[in-house]
Amino acid sequence: GYIRRANYYVAKGKDDQSYFDKAVADFNQALKVAAKKDDVYYNIAKLIYGYQLSKPETTYKDWTYDTALKNLRQAMAIDPLPVYTQLEGDILFAQQDYAGALAAYEKVNASNLASAASFFSAAKTKELLKADAKEVLALMDSCIARCPQPVTANFAPYLLERAQIYMNNDQARNAMLDYDAYYKAVNGQVNDLFYYYREQAALKARQYQRALDDIVKAVELSPKDLTYRAEHAVVNLRVGRYEESMKILNEILKDEPKYGEAYR
Protein backbone atom coordinates (compact mmCIF):
# COMPACT_ATOMS: atom_id res chain seq x y z
CA GLY A 1 0.00 0.00 0.00
CA TYR A 2 2.81 2.43 0.83
CA ILE A 3 4.49 1.94 -2.56
CA ARG A 4 1.21 2.39 -4.44
CA ARG A 5 0.56 5.61 -2.54
CA ALA A 6 4.14 6.80 -3.14
CA ASN A 7 3.56 6.28 -6.90
CA TYR A 8 0.43 8.40 -6.65
CA TYR A 9 2.34 11.14 -4.78
CA VAL A 10 5.13 11.18 -7.38
CA ALA A 11 2.56 11.64 -10.16
CA LYS A 12 1.09 14.59 -8.20
CA GLY A 13 4.56 15.96 -7.43
CA LYS A 14 5.00 17.27 -10.98
CA ASP A 15 2.82 20.22 -9.98
CA ASP A 16 3.65 20.43 -6.28
CA GLN A 17 7.03 19.21 -4.98
CA SER A 18 5.74 18.79 -1.41
CA TYR A 19 4.18 15.54 -2.65
CA PHE A 20 7.69 14.16 -3.16
CA ASP A 21 8.34 14.56 0.58
CA LYS A 22 5.23 12.45 1.21
CA ALA A 23 6.47 9.83 -1.25
CA VAL A 24 9.82 9.62 0.57
CA ALA A 25 8.01 9.18 3.91
CA ASP A 26 6.06 6.29 2.36
CA PHE A 27 9.26 4.71 0.99
CA ASN A 28 10.83 4.83 4.44
CA GLN A 29 7.73 3.37 6.07
CA ALA A 30 7.58 0.59 3.46
CA LEU A 31 11.23 -0.31 4.15
CA LYS A 32 10.47 -0.54 7.87
CA VAL A 33 7.47 -2.86 7.56
CA ALA A 34 8.12 -4.92 4.41
CA ALA A 35 9.09 -8.57 4.68
CA LYS A 36 10.60 -8.40 1.16
CA LYS A 37 12.84 -5.36 1.37
CA ASP A 38 14.33 -6.10 -2.06
CA ASP A 39 10.90 -5.50 -3.60
CA VAL A 40 10.70 -2.08 -1.92
CA TYR A 41 14.21 -1.08 -3.06
CA TYR A 42 13.32 -2.21 -6.60
CA ASN A 43 10.12 -0.14 -6.59
CA ILE A 44 11.97 2.92 -5.29
CA ALA A 45 14.56 2.49 -8.05
CA LYS A 46 11.86 2.06 -10.70
CA LEU A 47 10.04 5.16 -9.50
CA ILE A 48 13.14 7.37 -9.48
CA TYR A 49 14.20 6.01 -12.89
CA GLY A 50 10.74 6.84 -14.31
CA TYR A 51 10.91 10.28 -12.70
CA GLN A 52 14.30 11.02 -14.32
CA LEU A 53 13.11 9.70 -17.71
CA SER A 54 10.37 12.34 -17.63
CA LYS A 55 13.18 14.95 -17.74
CA PRO A 56 12.17 17.14 -14.76
CA GLU A 57 13.24 20.79 -15.05
CA THR A 58 14.82 20.70 -11.58
CA THR A 59 15.66 17.40 -9.93
CA TYR A 60 14.09 16.78 -6.53
CA LYS A 61 16.85 16.32 -3.89
CA ASP A 62 18.99 13.31 -4.87
CA TRP A 63 16.49 11.67 -7.24
CA THR A 64 19.06 10.91 -9.93
CA TYR A 65 19.85 7.82 -12.00
CA ASP A 66 22.70 7.16 -9.53
CA THR A 67 20.24 7.06 -6.62
CA ALA A 68 17.95 4.75 -8.60
CA LEU A 69 20.94 2.48 -9.25
CA LYS A 70 22.00 2.54 -5.59
CA ASN A 71 18.52 1.40 -4.48
CA LEU A 72 18.38 -1.22 -7.20
CA ARG A 73 21.74 -2.69 -6.21
CA GLN A 74 20.51 -2.96 -2.62
CA ALA A 75 17.60 -5.01 -3.97
CA MET A 76 20.02 -7.15 -6.04
CA ALA A 77 22.22 -7.77 -3.01
CA ILE A 78 19.21 -9.34 -1.26
CA ASP A 79 17.92 -11.30 -4.27
CA PRO A 80 19.48 -10.95 -7.75
CA LEU A 81 16.25 -11.45 -9.73
CA PRO A 82 16.41 -11.10 -13.54
CA VAL A 83 13.70 -8.39 -13.42
CA TYR A 84 16.08 -6.32 -11.26
CA THR A 85 18.91 -6.91 -13.74
CA GLN A 86 16.64 -5.73 -16.59
CA LEU A 87 16.04 -2.43 -14.77
CA GLU A 88 19.79 -2.15 -14.08
CA GLY A 89 20.36 -2.38 -17.84
CA ASP A 90 17.72 0.28 -18.50
CA ILE A 91 19.21 2.70 -15.95
CA LEU A 92 22.76 2.19 -17.25
CA PHE A 93 21.44 2.67 -20.81
CA ALA A 94 19.82 5.97 -19.76
CA GLN A 95 23.21 7.00 -18.29
CA GLN A 96 24.83 6.09 -21.63
CA ASP A 97 26.94 3.39 -19.97
CA TYR A 98 26.31 1.07 -22.91
CA ALA A 99 28.91 -1.55 -21.97
CA GLY A 100 27.37 -1.88 -18.49
CA ALA A 101 23.85 -1.97 -19.96
CA LEU A 102 24.82 -4.70 -22.43
CA ALA A 103 26.30 -6.86 -19.66
CA ALA A 104 23.00 -6.55 -17.76
CA TYR A 105 20.85 -7.34 -20.81
CA GLU A 106 23.02 -10.38 -21.62
CA LYS A 107 22.38 -11.72 -18.11
CA VAL A 108 18.63 -11.26 -18.63
CA ASN A 109 18.81 -12.99 -22.02
CA ALA A 110 20.43 -16.01 -20.36
CA SER A 111 17.62 -16.17 -17.77
CA ASN A 112 13.99 -17.28 -17.74
CA LEU A 113 12.99 -13.64 -18.23
CA ALA A 114 14.47 -13.50 -21.76
CA SER A 115 11.97 -11.89 -24.11
CA ALA A 116 11.68 -10.11 -27.44
CA ALA A 117 12.09 -6.81 -25.54
CA SER A 118 15.27 -7.88 -23.70
CA PHE A 119 16.92 -9.09 -26.92
CA PHE A 120 15.90 -5.87 -28.65
CA SER A 121 17.47 -3.85 -25.81
CA ALA A 122 20.70 -5.82 -26.23
CA ALA A 123 20.64 -5.29 -30.03
CA LYS A 124 20.17 -1.51 -29.74
CA THR A 125 22.94 -1.32 -27.13
CA LYS A 126 25.34 -3.32 -29.34
CA GLU A 127 24.51 -1.01 -32.22
CA LEU A 128 25.43 2.02 -30.10
CA LEU A 129 28.67 0.28 -29.15
CA LYS A 130 29.43 0.06 -32.92
CA ALA A 131 29.51 -3.75 -32.77
CA ASP A 132 29.70 -5.87 -35.92
CA ALA A 133 26.38 -5.78 -37.82
CA LYS A 134 26.28 -9.61 -37.77
CA GLU A 135 26.15 -9.56 -33.95
CA VAL A 136 23.39 -6.94 -33.93
CA LEU A 137 21.38 -8.91 -36.50
CA ALA A 138 21.82 -12.15 -34.52
CA LEU A 139 20.26 -10.41 -31.49
CA MET A 140 17.42 -9.03 -33.65
CA ASP A 141 16.82 -12.57 -34.97
CA SER A 142 16.54 -13.80 -31.37
CA CYS A 143 14.20 -10.89 -30.62
CA ILE A 144 11.87 -11.74 -33.51
CA ALA A 145 12.05 -15.49 -32.76
CA ARG A 146 10.54 -14.68 -29.34
CA CYS A 147 7.59 -12.82 -30.88
CA PRO A 148 4.31 -14.63 -31.58
CA GLN A 149 4.56 -16.30 -35.01
CA PRO A 150 3.34 -14.99 -37.37
CA VAL A 151 4.31 -11.65 -35.82
CA THR A 152 1.31 -9.67 -34.51
CA ALA A 153 0.75 -5.90 -34.69
CA ASN A 154 2.09 -5.29 -31.14
CA PHE A 155 5.44 -6.84 -32.04
CA ALA A 156 5.58 -5.55 -35.65
CA PRO A 157 7.86 -2.55 -34.88
CA TYR A 158 10.72 -5.03 -34.29
CA LEU A 159 10.44 -6.02 -37.97
CA LEU A 160 10.88 -2.37 -39.00
CA GLU A 161 13.96 -2.13 -36.78
CA ARG A 162 15.53 -5.22 -38.35
CA ALA A 163 14.62 -4.01 -41.85
CA GLN A 164 16.48 -0.77 -41.15
CA ILE A 165 19.58 -2.68 -39.98
CA TYR A 166 19.42 -4.83 -43.14
CA MET A 167 19.23 -1.67 -45.27
CA ASN A 168 22.21 -0.13 -43.49
CA ASN A 169 24.18 -3.28 -44.29
CA ASP A 170 23.28 -3.73 -47.96
CA GLN A 171 20.83 -6.58 -47.43
CA ALA A 172 17.93 -4.99 -49.28
CA ARG A 173 16.17 -8.24 -50.17
CA ASN A 174 16.01 -9.27 -46.50
CA ALA A 175 14.79 -5.78 -45.60
CA MET A 176 12.00 -6.15 -48.17
CA LEU A 177 10.89 -9.43 -46.59
CA ASP A 178 10.69 -7.73 -43.18
CA TYR A 179 8.69 -4.84 -44.63
CA ASP A 180 6.31 -7.37 -46.20
CA ALA A 181 5.95 -9.22 -42.87
CA TYR A 182 5.27 -5.88 -41.15
CA TYR A 183 2.58 -5.02 -43.71
CA LYS A 184 0.90 -8.35 -43.04
CA ALA A 185 1.21 -7.97 -39.24
CA VAL A 186 -0.59 -4.61 -39.25
CA ASN A 187 -3.20 -5.70 -41.84
CA GLY A 188 -1.98 -3.16 -44.37
CA GLN A 189 -2.58 -0.22 -42.00
CA VAL A 190 0.55 1.66 -43.12
CA ASN A 191 1.39 5.24 -44.08
CA ASP A 192 3.24 7.01 -46.90
CA LEU A 193 6.59 6.72 -45.08
CA PHE A 194 6.26 2.92 -44.95
CA TYR A 195 5.73 2.77 -48.72
CA TYR A 196 8.73 5.05 -49.25
CA TYR A 197 10.99 2.87 -47.08
CA ARG A 198 9.82 -0.35 -48.74
CA GLU A 199 10.30 1.27 -52.15
CA GLN A 200 13.91 2.08 -51.20
CA ALA A 201 14.47 -1.58 -50.30
CA ALA A 202 12.80 -2.80 -53.51
CA LEU A 203 14.89 -0.40 -55.60
CA LYS A 204 18.14 -1.58 -53.98
CA ALA A 205 17.02 -5.19 -54.49
CA ARG A 206 16.34 -4.37 -58.18
CA GLN A 207 12.66 -5.20 -57.85
CA TYR A 208 11.73 -2.24 -60.02
CA GLN A 209 8.02 -2.98 -60.52
CA ARG A 210 7.53 -3.32 -56.77
CA ALA A 211 9.49 -0.12 -56.20
CA LEU A 212 7.26 1.66 -58.71
CA ASP A 213 4.04 0.35 -57.10
CA ASP A 214 5.19 1.47 -53.64
CA ILE A 215 6.33 4.96 -54.62
CA VAL A 216 3.02 5.49 -56.46
CA LYS A 217 1.26 4.59 -53.19
CA ALA A 218 3.44 7.01 -51.21
CA VAL A 219 2.66 9.84 -53.67
CA GLU A 220 -1.06 8.97 -53.53
CA LEU A 221 -1.05 9.26 -49.74
CA SER A 222 1.06 12.44 -49.65
CA PRO A 223 0.80 14.15 -53.07
CA LYS A 224 2.63 17.33 -52.01
CA ASP A 225 5.77 15.57 -50.76
CA LEU A 226 8.52 16.52 -53.21
CA THR A 227 10.88 13.76 -52.05
CA TYR A 228 8.33 11.11 -53.02
CA ARG A 229 7.60 12.77 -56.35
CA ALA A 230 11.31 13.05 -57.21
CA GLU A 231 11.75 9.39 -56.22
CA HIS A 232 8.81 8.49 -58.49
CA ALA A 233 10.71 10.14 -61.35
CA VAL A 234 13.92 8.25 -60.48
CA VAL A 235 12.18 4.85 -60.49
CA ASN A 236 10.53 5.63 -63.84
CA LEU A 237 13.97 6.48 -65.16
CA ARG A 238 15.34 3.13 -63.91
CA VAL A 239 12.65 1.18 -65.79
CA GLY A 240 13.23 3.16 -68.96
CA ARG A 241 10.07 5.27 -68.80
CA TYR A 242 11.89 8.48 -69.74
CA GLU A 243 8.88 10.50 -70.88
CA GLU A 244 6.97 9.73 -67.69
CA SER A 245 10.05 10.66 -65.66
CA MET A 246 10.45 14.03 -67.43
CA LYS A 247 6.74 14.74 -67.03
CA ILE A 248 6.96 14.21 -63.24
CA LEU A 249 10.10 16.36 -62.94
CA ASN A 250 8.53 19.19 -64.93
CA GLU A 251 5.46 19.08 -62.70
CA ILE A 252 7.71 19.32 -59.62
CA LEU A 253 9.54 22.35 -61.06
CA LYS A 254 6.24 23.99 -61.96
CA ASP A 255 5.07 23.63 -58.34
CA GLU A 256 8.45 24.36 -56.76
CA PRO A 257 10.91 26.07 -59.15
CA LYS A 258 13.70 26.07 -56.52
CA TYR A 259 13.59 22.30 -55.89
CA GLY A 260 17.20 21.26 -56.54
CA GLU A 261 16.66 17.46 -56.53
CA ALA A 262 14.62 17.72 -59.73
CA TYR A 263 17.67 19.02 -61.62
CA ARG A 264 19.79 15.94 -60.94
Region locations from a protein language model:
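Register position in tetratricopeptide repeats
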Residues: 11, 50-51, 94, 128-129, ...
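TPR-repeat structural position
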Residues: 20, 65, 98, 132-133, ...
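Canonical positions in the second alpha-helix
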Residues: 29-30, 74-75, 107-108, 143, ...
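TPR alpha-solenoid repeat register
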Residues: 1, 39-40, 84-85, 118, ...
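Short coil turns that delineate tetratricopeptide repeat
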Residues: 35, 79-80, 113, 148, ...
